[in-house]
């Protein structure tokens, strides 16, 4: 199968050019002008459009069981939504397994979830929910099998203490893996939450008040220091929501510490006022939405390079689930927002089209740096000969209003309802195959491939 994309502006993280792009047998074969491929081939006219590498979303939660509920997107509906939003690769954060389970247990479970459902290519982050000799011995074997990043939690049921974190950091570093972490101070949150519940203060706004930014920032600072103690172990902070935590990361980077950070569209574009709306329960996620001042600080990090990745933390629970389970109490509400379909369009509209970032920086945030950090470069995140033919075509001339009824996930609402975006995803190709075109999903379940990722190699800081 040959596909020739003509007349578009091809953009990579290191530059852009108006040129044509030839994909053959799922692989980029040639870029340039006046390409004359052998017949037969499909021709796609991208006049006036940007031709970007397909998005790489390194933070999703599909089919996750959080005890009180299972998310309503499985690996078909979740990756279908991703494809329709220009994302061609996801790395899913696996949920917790049974108490005392081995690392391999959850990998086998999740490979079963995805095998016949995923529309796009996928991998997983391991999850370390307890520490013992068997777990530590498993890590290098898992890395050899293509799982080169693992997540630690400082909050929730399987939070690790500082000694366990140090053991994990050391072994992951020795094994060629990147440590990712959900950083929030669990004890401080539990104390604040108990105060509010005792006082009968259970409305959605108290979710945010029970998890102040200092809880997140303290945990970030602690992880930075523990990583240094563990031999300068590489560290990746997920879903950053505030400027104080970013300040700590800037300081670590200035001291040449190997730390990287992601944020998400919700922390750039939504704020804590959402909790005071009639549907405030739909915005329950952790860390919570912050104020506009924190948004501005994050946008500075997006613009000046301090933030490395924009992912989604897509974790969808329906409003029916939220209301039935919570009964109006924030502390009982399952956490998470949908967004895997909207990430690329929202960042393009609010970043590129406003002049906050260049098209090249857009690529760096949404595909190139995620691919580099998580062992997929140059197969993913790049349009060059030999790379996978993963492409998203965006037309900057089109304006669209986000409406849930036009989205492809399995949620019954969108936090982005009514947002107007300048720029539209008009086509998505995965390994040269069109899986979304002009509003219509054309992919199929099970075509996605499991990606064995390379051991961690730090990009140049």
UniProtKB/Swiss-Prot annotation:
Gene3D superfamilies in the cross-refs: Metal-dependent hydrolases, Urease, subunit C, domain 1
Pfam families registered for this protein in UniProt: Amidohydro_1
Note accompanying the cofactor annotation: Binds 2 divalent metal cations per subunit.
Catalytic activity as recorded in UniProt: D-5-phenylhydantoin + H2O = N-carbamoyl-D-phenylglycine + H(+)
Superkingdom of the source species: Bacteria
Chain positions with N6-carboxylysine modification: 151
Positions that bind a divalent metal cation 1: 59, 61, 151, 313
Cofactor(s), names only, from the UniProt record: a divalent metal cation
Keyword Cytoplasm: no
Family annotation (CDD domains): D-HYD (cd01314)
Gene Ontology CC terms: cytosol
Positions of a divalent metal cation 2 binding: 151, 182, 239
Reported modifications of this chain: Carboxylation allows a single lysine to coordinate two divalent metal cations.
Alphabetically ordered keywords of this record: Hydrolase, Metal-binding
Claim: Cell division is one of the keywords in the record: no
GO MF annotation, one: hydrolase activity, acting on carbon-nitrogen (but not peptide) bonds, in cyclic amides
Disulfide bond residue pairs: none
Family under the similarity heading: Belongs to the metallo-dependent hydrolases superfamily. Hydantoinase/dihydropyrimidinase family.
Subunit relationships: Homotetramer.
The protein, known as: D-phenylhydantoinase
Organism: Escherichia coli O7:K1 (strain IAI39 / ExPEC)
Organismal lineage: Bacteria, Pseudomonadati, Pseudomonadota, Gammaproteobacteria, Enterobacterales
């Amino acid at each position: 199968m040959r596909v020739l994309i003509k007349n578009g502006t091809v953009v990579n993280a290191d530059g852009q050019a108006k040129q044509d792009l030839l994909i053959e047998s799922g692989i980029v074969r040639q870029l340039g002008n006046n390409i004359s491929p052998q017949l037969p081939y499909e021709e796609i006219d991208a006049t006036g459009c940007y031709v970007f590498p397909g998005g790489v979303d390194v933070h999703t939660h599909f089919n996750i069981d959080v005890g009180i509920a299972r998310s309503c997107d499985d690996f078909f509906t979740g990756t279908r939504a991703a494809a329709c939003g220009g994302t061609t690769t996801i790395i899913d954060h696996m949920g917790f397994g049974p108490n005392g389970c081995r690392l391999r247990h959850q990998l086998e479970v999740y490979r079963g979830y995805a095998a016949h459902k995923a529309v796009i290519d996928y991998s997983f982050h391991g999850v370390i929910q307890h520490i013992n000799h068997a777990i530590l011995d498993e890590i290098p074997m898992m890395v050899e099998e293509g799982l080169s990043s693992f997540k630690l939690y400082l909050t929730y049921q399987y939070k690790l203490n500082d000694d366990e974190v140090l053991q994990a950091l050391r072994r992951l570093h020795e094994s060629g893996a990147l440590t990712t972490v959900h950083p929030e101070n669990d004890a401080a949150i539990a104390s604040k939450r108990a105060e509010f519940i005792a006082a009968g203060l259970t409305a959605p706004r108290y979710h945010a008040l029970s998890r102040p930014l200092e809880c997140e920032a303290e945990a970030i600072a602690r992880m930075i220091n523990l990583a240094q103690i563990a031999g300068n172990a590489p560290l990746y902070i997920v879903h950053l929501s505030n400027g104080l935590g970013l300040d700590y990361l800037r300081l670590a980077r200035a001291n040449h510490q190997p730390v990287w950070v992601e944020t998400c569209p919700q922390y750039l574009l939504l704020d804590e006022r959402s909790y005071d709306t009639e549907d405030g329960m739909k915005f329950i996620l952790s860390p919570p939405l912050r104020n506009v001042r924190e948004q501005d600080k994050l946008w500075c990090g997006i613009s000046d390079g301090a933030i490395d990745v924009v992912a989604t933390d897509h974790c969808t629970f329906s409003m029916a689930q939220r209301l039935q389970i919570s009964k109006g109490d924030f502390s009982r509400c399952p956490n998470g927002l949908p967004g895997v379909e909207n990430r690329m369009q929202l960042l393009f509209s609010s970043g590129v089209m406003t002049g906050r970032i260049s098209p090249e920086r857009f690529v760096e945030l949404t595909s190139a740096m995620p691919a580099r950090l998580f062992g997929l470069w140059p197969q993913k995140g790049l349009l060059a000969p030999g790379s996978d033919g993963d492409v998203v075509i965006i037309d900057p001339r089109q304006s669209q209003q986000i409406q849930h009824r036009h989205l492809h996930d399995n949620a019954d609402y969108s936090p982005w309802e009514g947002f107007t975006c300048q720029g539209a995803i008009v086509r998505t190709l995965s390994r040269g195959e069109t899986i979304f075109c002009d509003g219509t999903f054309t992919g199929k379940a099970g075509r996605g491939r499991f990606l064995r990722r390379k051991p961690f190699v730090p990009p140049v800081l």
